[in-house]
């Protein structure tokens, strides 16, 4: 970890941004029953081979890659741990390399996870309220933007 704040940081949400959690059959009833399988079973929303390659290029150019993902709403401590484990397993299954993983309480301010390390951070998140509350830099709405193309633009700009 760097002593000074990183000037190049990308922060990823997972559910509805990287993973198609909401496309898993009975996802909500399973989460309410404290079943972590929807987090493991969700399909990727992007071509993961290409996304991983682009993120490797970003990391080589000095970008730090963070995962900041909410845990399931109203869950026990044991289930929170199971959800963190399931989300990390999903990332490993799809070969996504990251620098830091933050599985945080549902509704938590995501910027708090990186504020002490981020001078300027880009948030990729499907939740409009989360994006509106992000004050560490720009945001990307993955429901309206091709994230891979946007990340390639960052590389081409040499930022």
Model-based region annotation:
Residues 119-158:
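Acidic, Mg2+-coordinating phosphoryl-transfer loop and its flanking beta/alpha structural elements
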Residues 68, 103-107, 142:
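Conserved beta-strand termini and adjacent loop/short-helix elements that scaffold enzyme active sites
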Residues 1-5, 113-116:
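A short acidic-Thr-Gly-centered motif at the start of a beta-strand
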Residues 92-94, 109-112, 127:
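Metal-dependent phosphoesterase core characteristic of DEDDh/y 3'-5' exonuclease domains
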Residues 8-10, 120-121:
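The start of beta-strands in P-loop NTPase/AAA+ ATPase cores
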Residues 19-22, 74-78, 110-113, 130-133, ...:
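Short catalytic/ligand-binding loop motif for oxyanion handling, primarily in non-cytosolic enzymes
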Residues 3, 9-93, 98:
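Alpha-helical substrate-recognition element adjacent to the catalytic core
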Residues 98-119:
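Donor nucleotide-activated moiety binding/catalytic core segment of transferases
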């Amino acid at each position: 970890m760097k002593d000074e704040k990183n000037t190049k940081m990308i922060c990823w949400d997972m559910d509805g941004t990287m993973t198609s959690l909401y496309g898993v059959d009975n996802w909500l009833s399973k989460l309410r029953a404290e079943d972590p399988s929807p987090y493991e079973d969700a399909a990727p929303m992007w071509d993961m081979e290409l996304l991983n390659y682009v993120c490797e290029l970003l990391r080589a150019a000095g970008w730090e890659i963070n995962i900041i993902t909410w845990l399931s709403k109203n869950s026990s401590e044991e289930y929170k741990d199971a959800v963190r484990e399931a989300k990390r397993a999903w990332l490993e299954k799809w070969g996504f390399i990251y620098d830091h993983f933050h599985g945080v309480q549902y509704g938590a301010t995501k910027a708090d996870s990186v504020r002490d390390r981020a001078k300027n951070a880009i948030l990729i998140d499907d939740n409009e309220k989360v994006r509106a509350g992000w004050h560490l830099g720009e945001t990307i709405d993955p429901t309206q933007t091709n994230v891979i193309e946007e990340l390639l633009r960052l590389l081409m700009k040499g930022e």
